[in-house]
Design a protein with these regions (language model features):
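Rossmann-like flavin
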Residues: 82-122
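Residues forming the flavin
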Residues: 1-77, 115, 135-267
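Gly-rich Lys/Arg/Thr-decorated short loops/hinges at beta-loop-alpha junctions or inter-strand turns
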Residues: 57-59, 83-87, 121-130, 204-210
Length: 267
């Protein structure tokens, strides 16, 4: 069902996933695969069918670690260099280790990645160390494919509800969340045994100097609300001083990151 909140003020579930962009559906699917009998809810402030930073599609993945093209060690080194050494290498390495399995899983969902005449992933060279860029000919179907998987596994979806605070139990453990409807301002309390935050980054925390809302490369929903919720619930936040925002070039549509020029002699 697409909406569990008709005339409902409270709801109980096993796992609450806040955020229905890309990470949220993946987390919800993993939870359901782990325990098919679990009640898993995806809470989204827009609509899961077309929400998140990848809502309108993606022309490629810039950070794929595929055997034969790159190693986890190479990727970790590349990311460390790109960030001037300010990098927590453990999660970066873990991401690199799991990357290929996730790509194959997405491939099985019908998300098509560019392949060569031998049927291998056609990864492109952009970074200094290793080869990581994997084009996606039908990247506009990512959300459709993920939504099909959610429906197939009968996960519960609550659209148009924005989480505002995490709930904690007497022992300090997270016990659910409070959300407000973005259309009629009604409140919903969801009690959960486990809560997973998949709420995107904070690249739209402020406006560009021009004041133009879409003058950056960041999705408008990436407002940092997940960080705020975690902080208010007692979580320790790290690396917020490493703020990244990608300005756009006027009247230009396409990749415009400076590091693209590096392997070709630019600086």
């Amino acid at each position: 069902m697409d909406n569990i909140t008709n005339n409902t003020e409270t709801f109980d579930c096993d796992v609450l996933v806040i955020g229905g962009g890309t990470a949220g559906p993946m987390a919800a699917l993993k939870a359901k695969m782990k325990n098919p009998d679990a009640t898993v809810v995806v809470l989204e402030k827009a609509n899961v069918k077309r929400s998140g930073a990848i809502s309108m599609g993606m022309d490629g993945l810039n950070n794929t670690v595929i055997p034969g093209h790159a190693t986890a060690e190479q990727y970790t080194k590349e990311i460390t260099i790109a960030n001037d050494g300010i990098c927590d290498q453990k999660p970066v390495y873990k991401y690199a280790e799991n990357c290929f399995d996730i790509i194959q899983e997405l491939d099985s969902y019908g998300i098509r990645f560019l392949k060569d005449e031998n049927g291998d992933y056609d990864v492109k060279k952009v970074h200094h160390i290793g080869t990581y860029v994997l084009p996606m000919p039908n990247g506009d179907t990512v959300k459709k494919a993920l939504y099909r998987q959610l429906r197939r596994r009968r996960l519960l979806i609550t659209n148009r509800y924005m989480a505002t605070r995490l709930l904690t139990g007497p022992d300090g453990r997270i016990a659910g969340a409070i959300a407000v409807n973005t259309r009629d301002a009604t409140f919903l309390t969801i009690r959960a045994k486990a809560v997973i935050l998949c709420m995107g980054a904070a690249g739209r925390l402020g406006l560009p100097a021009s004041g133009y809302l879409y003058g950056t490369y960041e999705n408008a929903a990436n407002s940092g609300d997940g960080y705020a919720m975690a902080y208010h619930a007692g979580a320790q936040l790290a690396n917020l001083e490493c703020y990244q925002i990608n300005p756009l070039i006027k009247d230009y549509n396409g990749p415009a990151c400076a590091y693209v020029a590096g392997p070709f002699g630019g600086y």
